[in-house]
């Protein structure tokens, strides 16, 4: 059996990280790969499309009901979904109480100790990436996830989060084997999005793994709690996810140590690509619009 590949999908909240990861994993299982998902996002939506259900019970919530995590059995926290994909959700505490990362640590330790990592080809961590705090960095810090894939778009905050995640990877790259596998751009139809994604990947000493086009069929599938792979297997969007899965499958051992950039460099990139305008440019455009309005009013 080939060596276990531990991959992680990081990205800012709302970027479509969980949707992208579940569609990619559904395509990977078509390649004959055995997969375990460890959801590390407090929203606990990392397995919804694979299980065709509202939301899976989390390790932390089940442990609270049972008394402690030691009172749980593996079958309590692990459900089997699409084509045999094993699904677990770490969960998090009540809002405003405690550290959400604690659930990640507790869940991973429990799963490892109870044999969840046996007889799988991939373990996939789906991790919130707005803030790479100690808890959410746990799959990186504890040398669990070896390949990190950052889901981003051409929007400013998605780029900012991607650069922040790269900083987190760099911090632990020397002490462990974690590497940046690449960037996945979820199209938001912003100006020059593909060019910007490729440029950021190059600046981070990485590559753009795949550019996922925006398509309404993704939302249609989500409303039915399904991946596009299951809902519309013959669609063009399903083919996009299969291409992404194939690229990740072929990317073993090709990860890099990232080279994060400064905020000034990031803003400079946005200016270079015409995404972010200087104050002078913005004022000139505003003056032009006002002049056009005035001319129209007097015509």
Swiss-Prot record:
Residue positions binding ATP: 11-18
Catalyses which reaction(s): N2 + 8 reduced [2Fe-2S]-[ferredoxin] + 16 ATP + 16 H2O = H2 + 8 oxidized [2Fe-2S]-[ferredoxin] + 2 NH4(+) + 16 ADP + 16 phosphate + 6 H(+)
Entry EC number(s): 1.18.6.1
Post-translational changes noted in the entry: The reversible ADP-ribosylation of Arg-102 inactivates the nitrogenase reductase and regulates nitrogenase activity.
Residues binding [4Fe-4S] cluster: 99, 133
UniProt modified residues of type ADP-ribosylarginine: 102
GO BP: nitrogen fixation
GO molecular function annotations of the record: 4 iron, 4 sulfur cluster binding; ATP binding; metal ion binding; nitrogenase activity
UniProt cofactor(s): [4Fe-4S] cluster
Keywords (A to Z) from UniProt: 4Fe-4S, ADP-ribosylation, ATP-binding, Iron, Iron-sulfur, Metal-binding, Nitrogen fixation, Nucleotide-binding, Oxidoreductase
Subunit and interaction comment: Homodimer.
The protein's role, per its UniProt record: The key enzymatic reactions in nitrogen fixation are catalyzed by the nitrogenase complex, which has 2 components: the iron protein and the molybdenum-iron protein.
Family: Belongs to the NifH/BchL/ChlL family.
NCBIfam families registered for this protein in UniProt: nifH
Protein name per UniProt: Nitrogenase iron protein
Gene: nifH
